[in-house]
UniProtKB/Swiss-Prot annotation:
Textual note on the cofactor: Binds 1 Fe(2+) ion per subunit.
Positions with a binding annotation for substrate: 136-140, 170, 183, 187, 282
UniProt xrefs under CDD domains: ASKHA_NBD_TsaD_bac
Family the entry assigns: Belongs to the KAE1 / TsaD family.
Protein name as catalogued: tRNA N6-adenosine threonylcarbamoyltransferase
GO molecular function, one term: iron ion binding
UniProt-annotated binding residues for Fe cation: 113, 117, 310
Source organism of this protein record: Cutibacterium acnes (strain DSM 16379 / KPA171202) (Propionibacterium acnes)
Cellular component terms (Gene Ontology): cytoplasm
Subcellular location(s) per record: Cytoplasm
EC number: 2.3.1.234
Function of the molecule: Required for the formation of a threonylcarbamoyl group on adenosine at position 37 (t(6)A37) in tRNAs that read codons beginning with adenine. Is involved in the transfer of the threonylcarbamoyl moiety of threonylcarbamoyl-AMP (TC-AMP) to the N6 group of A37, together with TsaE and TsaB. TsaD likely plays a direct catalytic role in this reaction.
GO biological process, one term: tRNA threonylcarbamoyladenosine modification
Cofactor entry: Fe(2+)
Amino acid sequence: MSEPLILGIESSCDETGVGIVRGNDLLANEVASSMEQHVRFGGVVPEVASRAHLEAIVPVLDKAASTAGVDLSELDGIAVTAGPGLAGALVVGLSAAKALASWLNKPLYGVNHLAGHVAVDLLEHGELPMPCGALLVSGGHTSLLWVNDIATDIIEVGSTIDDAAGEAYDKVARVLGLPYPGGPVIDKAAAEGDPTAIRFPRGLTARHDMVKHRFDYSFSGLKTAVSRWVETQQRDGVEFRIADVAASFQEAVADVLTAKAVDMCQEYGLTHFLIGGGVAANSRLRTLLAERMADAGVELRRPRPGLCTDNGAMIAALGVQVVKAGLPASAMDISADSGLPIETVLV
């Protein structure tokens, strides 16, 4: 039996992505980002994102089909992000997928955006031994997952109880007078700084947190600590290096993310682990996680940075797994679900 040929559409936030995948082979991955339109607002504006998706979806779709060199009539199915994400943005991608599936008379698969971040690793490293652990870290989500089967059985073991890691990056960047989005600019600034210059707090790592929040994250306190530290220095007229603050903040984030990931692997006897999501492109996080997983005897899978951010290829990759699992197609009247839980891989 030939490998499924799946087209994936992603529109959960500010990237309009279309990917085409045959099995674990990536044929096309085209992305149009509306990031520049959100910079002056200091964050993603849902209405602006939705309008950008409307303008970009057809050109991106055409480019992906051309790059892949396949006739859309050859597709075995259309996969699309059904959630979680911005409601209006999701509707644009879902509507496009429904129209395409109807026109081509192909099955529609509404899938979970977060599970897509797990599935995308298959495109780079091939089949993933199960069970495995996963850390998904982005602007909207920070979760530790137990993955028994990418298409049917993903369990959230821990998550953030307040801000996601990516949100903290954006807010700290604003405090430091750095532009949006905060992740890349703080990563760049931190490269010139001293990560030991300031000891910022690591949320939910105290002994009393281990009972209820052993595998959960909290970045609100860290964000506040950085803000207050900067305010104090400015009030007292003390000069400081932005690079040192950025590096110290980034070290705190990477430290707690990786420590809990390793703890999860040791607690559940996991020997394979992967990382995904936009913040997974962060250089310090990738390096520290690799070091700590190696010390723990756990094989780490890290997709290249370009596959960590939102894209259509990850949705197509997940669609392939759904088809190979023999799961039924989604109904054509499915709705977008901005709060779709990770446990629901297929809608």
